[in-house]
């Protein structure tokens, strides 16, 4: 099937896969790559040390991704014309990369390294989970936060099963 953009800023499958996790970061003081050729595959801000961030994120050994330090200048959206320091997310295994949890892991790392510039409170504008924000502010691990949702996710999968039309 030919690719049809589901959104003007979602131009390929990688961006569509990463969007549910990286899109959560949009309301913070961070560019998610809008105004570049690779929205949702990159993110950054002028206040970030891109080398440090890539090293810290790669240290997570998160499944299905690796992070490459980059600098970019968005032509629209946040930080127009400013040099943003950040990372390029290389999707290595889309089948085994829980992207919403990836967004939480990235937010945890950004908050640890760059609070208050990162603005964790605005992360909740899309996450809509105030308890998770409190846990992130307290420095709770992202693994523990996302694990606390597991039973609710399993319940949802059971409830939705009768409505799935494709396997």
Language-model-derived ranges and their functions:
Residues 7-13, 35, 56-60:
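A generic short-segment signal for beta-strand/edge and adjacent turn/coil regions
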Residues 18-46, 86-90:
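C-terminal accessory domains and tails appended to enzymatic cores
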Residues 44-148:
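Conserved functional hotspot residues or short segments at active or partner-binding sites
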Residues 155-167:
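Structural signal for terminal/edge beta-strands and the immediately following C-terminal loop/tail
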Residues 28-29, 36, 71, 76, ...:
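Solvent-exposed, flexible loop/coil residues
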């Amino acid at each position: 099937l030919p690719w049809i953009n589901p959104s003007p800023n979602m131009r390929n499958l990688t961006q569509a896969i990463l969007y549910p996790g990286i899109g959560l970061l949009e309301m913070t003081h961070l560019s998610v790559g809008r105004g570049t050729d690779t929205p949702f595959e990159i993110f950054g801000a002028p206040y970030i040390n891109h080398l440090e961030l890539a090293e810290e994120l790669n240290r997570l050994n998160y499944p299905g991704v690796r992070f490459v330090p980059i600098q970019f200048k968005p032509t629209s959206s946040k930080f127009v014309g400013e040099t943003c320091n950040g990372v390029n997310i290389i999707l290595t295994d889309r089948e085994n990369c829980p992207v919403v949890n990836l967004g939480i892991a990235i937010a945890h790392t950004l908050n640890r390294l760059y609070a208050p510039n990162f603005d964790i409170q605005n992360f909740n504008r899309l996450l809509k989970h105030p308890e998770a924000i409190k846990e992130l502010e307290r420095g709770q691990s992202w693994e523990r936060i996302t694990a606390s949702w597991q039973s609710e996710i399993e319940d949802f999968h059971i409830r939705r099963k009768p409505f799935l039309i494709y396997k």
